[in-house]
Structures are given as C-alpha cells and as structure tokens.
Amino acid sequence: MAASEKISDIKSKGTAWILGVLAAISISIVFVLSQWWGREPQQFNILESAISQAGLTASTPAEGEGTEGGEGEHGASTETASYEILAADLPLGYTYSATLAHIADTLLNKSGGYITNDVAPPGVLLDNITSWEMGALVMLRDASTALRNHFSRDQSQSGEDPDLAIAEPYFYYEPNSWALPATEAEYEKGIQALHKYMERLRDPSKGKKAQFYSRADNLWQYTEVVIKRLGDLSTRLSSNASSSNFAPGLTNLELEEASGKVAAKVGWMEIDNVFYEARGASWALLHILRAIKHDFHDILLDKRAMRTVDIMIRELENSLTPTMSPMVLDGNGYGLFANYSLAMANYIARANAAALDLRDIMNRG
C-alpha cells in the first residue's frame, strides 16, 4: 500500500515537473516571438521601392567610384543620385502609387506579419503593434482614397480609374477578420489592383491609359484630410496631461468652448495604444509626404511650398525617434520621468501647423 502510494507520488511529481518545463518553454517562446513581432518596421527609400516595383535596376558605380573611401557619405550620395536618375524615367504618380503599395505590403509582411486579426498568442497579446498597424492603415486608406477620387481624375465629372475603384475598397475591409475572408487576403487584392494601375501608368498598351494629375487643388483636398487626422492624434495624445488638452495658443477654456465639450482624459492603460497608433500614422504619412514631394515637385516649387513639406517631413521623422524605455513613460511637467505622449503630440502638432500652411498655400490662386 505504501509502495503504491510512493510510486503514485513520484509519477504525479514527474508529471508536474514535465508540465512546468513545458510551460516555461512555452512562455519563453511567446516572449521571444513577442519581442520580434512587436518591432516597428524600418523606414524605406521611396525611390528605391518605386524603381524596384517598376523592374528597373540601379546602375553600379564604375570601378574606383564609391569604393575607396566611397562607403559612407559619398557612397550614399552616389546611390541616391543613381535612384534619382532612374526615377526620372518613371511616369508622374508612379512613385506615389508604389509608396502606397509598399506601405500595404509592409503591413502584411513585417516581422510577424499582419497581427491585428490574430486570435492566438503571442499576436493577441501585442496591443502596441496592433495600434501601430491601425495608425498606418488609416493613413493608407486616406491616401488611396485621395488617389482614387482626386489625383487620378481630371475634373469632378471625370470617370474614375477602374483599377483604383477596385483597390480602394479592399483597403477598407475590416482589419480584424481572421478568416472567410482573412484581412490579409483582401488587402493583397488591393495591392494587386494598385499594381495594375501602376502598370498602365508606365505602359498604356496594357489597357486604358492611367492618369495622375499633380494639381494644387488635388493636394489641397488631401491636405484637408491630413489636418483632421493629425489634429485628432495630437488631441488624444495630450489629453492625459494635467492640462487635459493641448493646442498651441489655446487655453483649456477656449478649447472647451470651441469643441462644445470637455475632452475625455485618456488613461495610462490606454495612452500607450494611442502613442503607437500615432507612431504608425507618422511612419506611413512620412513616406506618403516624401512621395508627394517627388510627384508634386513642380507645383510645390511653383507655389513655394517645398519648405513647408520639408517641415512636415522633419517633424514626422523626429516623432519616430527610437524610445529609450520599453514602456510608454507618462511623466508630468518637469518631473523625473519623460512624457512620451506629450513629446509625440508636440511633434505632430508642429507637423499639423505646417499642414495648415500647406493647405492655405495650395488654396491660393
């Protein structure tokens, strides 16, 4: 009797030990995957991306050029010049469209793939990167809508491009659908339709010639949307501060009178999601603005608005500075700890101020 109890006790302890080891291994795997999948994607070169999608190849520097002492600034400048030469052969609007396709592709194929619709660990636990994806997705949707409704149409009475009419709705598919159909499958269809539009931009023989109009009124209409997006992000980022609201030149009372209500305070458990949503939106908008700077180059020079776009780009670049803490710090005033959300709100507010200037410049005759 005692012997059987002893054997049973040993078996139960062995089972518990095995289960404990398996649990420790599982937790370790989930932790490692969480660190890998939770990384924000790196920035990319919009010209290099457009050239790659067009099937062009950058020329290699001749022997002796960019080799000895060429690595570094000279090598980088040579490579950039090579991209600019090749990009000059691309039709107007190709770089902008290729940038949207690259942003969508990054959402699907970054570390861990698209995570918002995951139903199992570790993806279901990663709320920061899912917020990042939502921020980037909103900017992608706005830019694809602008391409369909404004940039590709000559007048309000003009017919819309057939491929863009297919591409845009796919990007508006619900972001958290796991299956039947999966979100990734729908977004992939949007990318494919966008590529068909890009092919017709380069080669009219592949169907009805695609159009892209880089006009001031088109850019003005898109800038209106950007202003609203940035304003919303700036307000939500700063709403957890002691002053409850943040806007240059406005007091709390003036803000309440202007909006007609008191802005809800975002709690500490939610502000990290808003912070990463703003990071994702800034990442996507940064690349879109670089593409606009390229494809709207002539109109921006003519309107003397190039510096305004550069200010927006610089502030968004600053907003993407790597954080030193694994947690979103929520300090106050001149306290010991930084306040990441207020720092981000400051950069976005300055980018929004430049967007207001850009809208006014584009709206002038």
Task: Label the predicted regions.
Residues E48-E186:
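N-terminal Sec/ER secretory leader and immediately downstream segment
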Residues F31, Q35, R39, F44-A54, ...:
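A cross-kingdom marker for long, charged
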Residues Y94-S97, A101, T130-L137, Q157, ...:
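Amphipathic, non-membrane alpha-helical segments in soluble helical-bundle scaffolds
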Residues W17-V32:
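Hydrophobic membrane-insertion alpha-helices, especially the h-region
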Residues M1-I18:
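N-terminal positive-inside, membrane-proximal cytosolic segments immediately preceding the first
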Residues E184-I313, L320:
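Extended amphipathic alpha-helical interaction segments
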Residues N117-N128, P181, V262-D272, S325-A343:
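A cross-kingdom feature marking solvent-exposed beta-strand/loop segments within repeated
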